[in-house]
Amino acid sequence: PNLDHNPNTGGMGGFSPHPWLDGELKDKIMKKIAIPTVRGFREATGHSYVGVIYFGLMISEEREPSVLEINVRLGDPEAQVILPRLETDFFQLSEALLDGNLGSQTLSWSKDYCLGICAISGRAIKPLTSGTAGGGERPGYPGEHYTNMPISGLEKVDPEVLVYHNGTAFGQDAARKKRLFTTGGRVLTLVARGESLAQ
């Protein structure tokens, strides 16, 4: 409760599977949120919804779900920690979705855990030179943050770790060397996999 005053941001990390998400909670989410949403869409538009629906939920201590947001796309960084565990062919699922045969598909999941964390544009550690992205102090993401900052160290990342580029672009540094630069607040998501969450 003492930490509930911080701003709602884009996802800063995640892990999958979640230990709270048991059969009882899944049923509650389906009955209270997912099925009424899809049914309401059909009643309001006369069309069946075909695609991905992402429900951003908050689960209370009483295990009651509340909706924060609904998107018609995969969540970010949620997809980065969920999809590596999917063993069913994603293209096959997409085809079945478009053909109206998704109900015939069986999803197969790895028992491994995936944990992801976002590297963000934070507060500058030292004042920037006047020619760099406007200079001056900035608080960092989710507030005003620096862009066009060089990214280094990716060659040191364990090869088993997945690196997703969220806010990066190639450019040239002062020596005209091609390298990665930041373009947004959430810059990279690094996802590791293990047999347990602790691993």
Language model: regions and residue ranges:
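Short, well-ordered beta-strand elements within core beta-sheets of diverse protein domains
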Residues: G14-P17, I117-A119, R186-G194
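Generic long, charged, amphipathic alpha-helical segments
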Residues: H145-T189
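Short acidic-glycine loop/turn motifs at beta-strand connectors
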Residues: I59-R63, S121-G122, Q172
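Short, surface-exposed charged micro-motifs
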Residues: G56
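Protein kinase-like catalytic core scaffold
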Residues: I53, S66-L68, R186
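ATP-dependent carboxylate/phosphate-activation module, predominantly the ATP-grasp catalytic core
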Residues: P1-I33, V72-L86
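Short amphipathic alpha-helices within nucleic acid-binding modules
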Residues: S196-A198
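Active-site "cap" helix and flanking loop/linker of ATP-utilizing ligase/carboxylase catalytic domains
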Residues: M30-I53, N71-D158
